[in-house]
Amino acid sequence: MADVDELEDPMEEMTSYTFARFLRSPETEAFVRNLDRPPQMPAMRYVYLYCLCEQIQEFSGETGFCDFVSSLVQENDSQDGPSLKSIYWGLQEATDEQRTVLCSYVESMTRGQSENLMWDILRNGIISSSKLLSTIKNGPTKVFEPAPISTNHYFGGPVAFGLRCEDTVKDIVCKLICGDASANRQFGFMISPTDGIFGVSLDLCVNVESQGDFILFTDRSCIYEIKCRFKYLFSKSEFDPIYPSYTALYKRPCKRSFIRFINSIARPTVEYVPDGRLPSEGDYLLTQDEAWNLKDVRKRKLGPGHDLVADSLAANRGVESMLYVMTDPSENAGRIGIKDRVPVNIFINPRHNYFYQVLLQYKIVGDYVRHSGGGKPGRDCSPRVNIVTAFFRKRSPLDPATCTLGSDLLLDASVEIPVAVLVTPVVLPDSVIRKTLSTAAGSWKAYADNTFDTAPWVPSGLFADDESTP
């Protein structure tokens, strides 16, 4: 890689220095040819990150990652710094705790997501939470060629709506539901420290601590994945088909009125699935409560090939979601609070992409807890996971100009009015996690082998039935 001082635009050079380009570089290919065995992950991922950070630290001022790697290298065999070989072997021998420190540096450097160039670059060669299901189904065809992150979203569309309302949902969870629990609301890119091929970024996590620039996850940490439902956005108007059902829910918050509200649109977000039947892939929430069975829809039986779905359904069927109905600011001097709580039998759909999204978040945060000292002896190091479904209405002339969440947290004037929040706990069986990650890792390995002459091997711990992969 060219020296930064020789580049007309070092930032432009950085944005093109992907993991794929690193693997194809003459320096890397020469280094690999001199090894007595193929290079391994995650060490090669960290070697790449070292090379990237070494180039950008001259104008970013961030030296922590490279300094920590240097402390792991036994020999400095060059006046210009350690060789790739020395760096690789230092990282190959690193402990999971040391690798987690390296990943924590990366997370701290990449906060801001779409506004952070490094966050975009690091997705190359990574199976992210949003790509996990497609990788299992179709292979990682886009993992080494991810589409650029788009920030130009139509204001009135669903993506812009979700981005606009996400902070409001975080405020509701942190202030009104969790009672001002310690929380982190902005995360960088979190690479799995033990394998280097999976990565996630969280919306919100409560019960976390700070250690300098690092986030310390604990065995009490709770992840919240936020979904703002654009298709339920409605107006306070008798001509809006959703409004009458919302009015009934607001006047009498209960299971029956919530069922009416959810089914007020053509493709409702909750699907009724009786025991022993296969859910569709249409949306991400299910129920087995007969009260939701409003129309006769024939469903296939669970059968051969549905083992993971069956295991996940069995683990989640008993889950109780909590619906929080919010007060109307036009009736409460602009104040939005929790009007009522309604428990409902709603759980996640294990055939939907969002299930795999939170599965990978659960796995990686669990790795951070185990390898960063956040877990107490004798306690499960796994975090809790919830998916949050938020419903909004458009602003009305009757709404006060200034609205607050609780008594003092100002609601941005550009954001719609939150009317209800559904919090759904997610249970992730170990067998489902192992099989899912094993399948995805095998797909990543096969694609890398066919794409790169210097493809690094994947850790054997990801392969439940394959002892041949080092």
UniProtKB/Swiss-Prot annotation:
One of its GO terms (cellular component) is host cell nucleus. Signal peptide: none annotated. Pfam families: Viral_alk_exo. Its EC number is 3.1.-.-. It is found in: Host nucleus; Host cytoplasm. GO terms for molecular function: DNA binding; endonuclease activity; exonuclease activity; RNA binding. Keywords: Decay of host mRNAs by virus, Early protein, Endonuclease, Eukaryotic host gene expression shutoff by virus, Exonuclease, Host cytoplasm, Host gene expression shutoff by virus, Host mRNA suppression by virus, Host nucleus, Host-virus interaction, Hydrolase, Nuclease, RNA-binding. Its main location: host cell. InterPro entries: Herpes_alk_exo (IPR001616), Restrct_endonuc-II-like (IPR011335), Viral_alk_exo (IPR034720). The record marks 166, 203, 225, 227 as: Required for function. SUPFAM superfamilies: Restriction endonuclease-like (SSF52980). One of its GO terms (biological process) is symbiont-mediated suppression of host gene expression. It is an enzyme of class 3 (hydrolase). Forms a complex with the DNA polymerase, the DNA polymerase processivity factor, and the major DNA binding protein. Plays a role in processing non linear or branched viral DNA intermediates in order to promote the production of mature packaged unit-length linear progeny viral DNA molecules. Exhibits endonuclease and exonuclease activities and accepts both double-stranded and single-stranded DNA as substrate. Exonuclease digestion of DNA is in the 5'-> 3' direction and the products are 5'-monophosphate nucleosides. Additionally, forms a recombinase with the major DNA-binding protein, which displays strand exchange activity. Belongs to the herpesviridae alkaline nuclease family. This is Shutoff alkaline exonuclease. It comes from Epstein-Barr virus (strain AG876). The lineage of its organism: Viruses, Duplodnaviria, Heunggongvirae, Peploviricota, Herviviricetes.
